């Protein structure tokens, strides 16, 4: 009789254990369900050739230089953006800029003046041999979806002139088919990054502290 009871008990335990293995623990089921509910993330590679990234520096000075601002184009940059096409998060942005690719584009300057500005931009302002890269990496994305686009604020760390600061970049983002489009603007205080003001043209020009950035960036979907 005892042998029969033991046999039945072992059978019940075996059946229960088998059911446990097939079904899994409640935590496992919850984790699998949560994973299935996560939005699919799509990656886009930034295409500098189709994008526009500008830096505007207002100036004060004397004589005919007064009131003529700098329009600096960022020529060489790359990076990757990731987001869900039907939800704001998860989302991220990583951007790398070759500092030596920045150059004056304003048509108010002669080519000789542009050469002077570009030389000081690389040698004095950005010190590109010492600090060849400018980078940004997001750690938080907030915002909402409205009228077919995302209005977002991208928080993250920017490294400029060897100094790391946390900034927030507002942007309007749309994704259509294979293409991502992001537009926006933000500003930085050059003094917080130990960036020198150039004194081109024998000291007649002085750049203000505030640098204004505008971007119209295109990314192509990574297959």
Name each model-derived stretch.
Residues 7-16:
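Hydrophobic membrane-insertion alpha-helices, especially the h-region
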